[in-house]
């Protein structure tokens, strides 16, 4: 992959991340608390913190990526599948960063 191709990959990923958050915020968050669903998830999860809940949700995507990697190079996933799984993992890492920073702010 050339530098120019990688820059294009980055821009597409950033755009997709913003698009995903715009859509999902209406479903899982409020203007007052973007992490509301993770805080409510504490009651449904085996974890006792919103960060633990987010990590649990993220692990599903990490496991999927691990499976994709284990099948390479013989079986290469579609771009659509790869972009979805990598994007979901990135999104959960951003959420985890925000949750941890929010805890430090309180």
Could you say what each language-model-derived stretch is?
Residues 1-106:
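Intrinsically disordered, low-complexity regulatory regions
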